[in-house]
Amino acid sequence: MGSSNLELIFDSVGHFGRYQIFLYFICAFQNISCGIHYLASVFLSVSPQHTCRPPGNVSQVLFQDLSTWQLEDIWTQFSVGREDRILVQLQDGAIWELTSCQRFRRDDQSSLDYEYSGQKSSFPCLDGYIYDRSKWLSTVVTQWDLVCNREWFGRLIQPTFMFGVLLGAVIFGYLSDRAGRRLVLWASSTGVFLFGIAAAFTFDYYSFIVARFLLAISGSGYLVVVFVYVTEFVGMKSRTWASIHLHSFFAFGTMVVALTGYFVRTWWIYQIVLSSVTVPFVLCCWMLPETPFWLISGGKYEEAQKVIDTMAKWNRTRPCKLSEILSLDHDGSAGNKPSQVEKHTLSELFYDWSIGTRTLILWLIWFTGCLGFYTFSLNSVHLGGSEYLNLFLMGVVEIPAYVLVCLGMDRVGRRNILIFSLLSSAVTSGVIMVIPKDYHVWLVVASMAGKFFIGAAFGLIYLYTAELYPTIVRSLAVGSGSTVGRVGSIVAPLCIYLSSVWIFMPQLLVGTLALVSGVLTFLLPETLRRPLTTTWEETEKESSSGKLLSTTSNTVLENVTVENSEDSSLNK
């Protein structure tokens, strides 16, 4: 059945009535949970100041000008980023020099003094570490000593999670077309809850990574399928607005992470609290109906009619008869008769030199958008001041970014908004690099601006990509772009660690990519008020003619999500 005829359903029962609003906010609520887990590692994997634990009971501690009886008292004097030696004398009289990753035993034990020129022996930290617990009572790092030669274990927590995100989009996108959207929404959200709780009760690092990996697969699967679910229940007149603002609920998840991190300072309790956000949706999701689009595609017309009747009843509108709409296809009076869906390969995105260049530019924009989105968020806790407030503000600033996209894309054009957002993000990254690191407030403000612009670019790239390709490869183009974007998400936490080379290295990388992407976007055509094309020939003709015709962005989302929901994923 032609997908255009299905829109007659919404013309009858309403494009965004009470029923769709009810379903929309139920589904969007779970997006908060996904946003939570995507950034939960910001505080889960905090690595506090630490020093080697001495091999015995301490009788006296000397640190700079502080003399005390226990090591825990020295953290107020500790300098961040400075390798300070701590002198301790054990109850057996042995004197040790302690650093963050090594300890030295002095041969001469006559006096506890920094001035020492005698022999000393080096030993690894076999007795573990003592951590500064003034901020966090416990983190994953302190739980399993992920410091020094095990530091890279801690640095893999977020990249492995993002790899799970990549895998989950593929798995659940495939399953949703076979088993239905409703079942997959229930399974993925249940997985988010169960694996989120399981991560809090893991017994070692490896089981924690596995639980988080499965959590990422489930959360990513939900984000993929909920986008399809929402767009198949919302009519064309409201579809673009509704789909873009699903991002806003993800941003609320970022704020919840910041608030929870502020009030809960033990990692496993923090993990349980964050995972509990999923409970309301898990309890309610069994009430969600299957989408009429999926039911019709599977020949379940009676079930589809029941859902349509329910929509009409809730919306207080006139119900439509599905049999009448279906008959339009059979008598040929509207739409087209169903045809076999032809499989297309990635090579078709390189149809010719011009299209191949277009594809590579869009892939770069997808990569830059995801890389910048997570780099600004993850790096916010390193800007100074309150890391909790910083992260909270990074979530707040996303919401006006999506409003900008919705208001601006139909007025000044998709390409112009994208160019402005990318170049502004590049300029903001440059501004951050010239702000002295002691100016915490200005660094946070500039980072918020960077997150605003890169968020706007990311919120628009899905729609823009869909409009640049003909119907025969539209889903493939969007799916490949989102996959490249997820690679950027995997790289983002690794990019943050480059700050150990130079404090502003992450901003330099993001700013450079945003600048290059913004300049290259000038080579792409504008799609505002241009008709969607079906074949490559139409695409070439439209590009060469430059003719402007009336169309709506909502049609793009309808075509992409209905024709091949497996590849159409709006996934962070």
UniProtKB/Swiss-Prot annotation:
Glycosylation sites noted in the Swiss-Prot or TrEMBL record: 57, 315, 559
Upper taxonomic lineage: Eukaryota, Metazoa, Chordata, Craniata, Vertebrata
Entry GO CC: cytosol; plasma membrane
Pfam families documented for this protein: Sugar_tr
Functional description taken from the UniProt entry: Facilitative organic cation transporter that mediates the transport of carnitine as well as the polyamine spermidine. Mediates the partially Na(+)-dependent bidirectional transport of carnitine. May mediate L-carnitine secretion from testis epididymal epithelium into the lumen which is involved in the maturation of spermatozoa.
Name by which UniProt lists this protein: Solute carrier family 22 member 16
Reaction equations catalysed: (R)-carnitine(in) = (R)-carnitine(out); spermidine(in) = spermidine(out)
Transmembrane segments: 21-41, 156-176, 183-203, 208-228, 244-264, 268-288, 359-379, 389-409, 416-436, 441-461, 476-496, 503-523
Membrane topology of this protein: Multi-pass membrane protein
Biological-process GO terms, alphabetical: acid secretion; carnitine transmembrane transport; cell differentiation; flagellated sperm motility; monoatomic ion transport; organic cation transport; single fertilization; spermatogenesis
Protein family per UniProt: Belongs to the major facilitator (TC 2.A.1) superfamily. Organic cation transporter (TC 2.A.1.19) family.
PANTHER family with a match to the protein in the record: SOLUTE CARRIER FAMILY 22 MEMBER
Keywords, sorted A to Z: Cell membrane, Developmental protein, Differentiation, Glycoprotein, Ion transport, Membrane, Spermatogenesis, Transmembrane, Transmembrane helix, Transport
InterPro entries found in the cross-reference section: MFS_dom, MFS_sugar_transport-like, MFS_trans_sf
GO terms of molecular function: amine transmembrane transporter activity; carnitine transmembrane transporter activity; organic cation transmembrane transporter activity; spermidine transmembrane transporter activity
Major place of residence: membrane
Localisation: Cell membrane
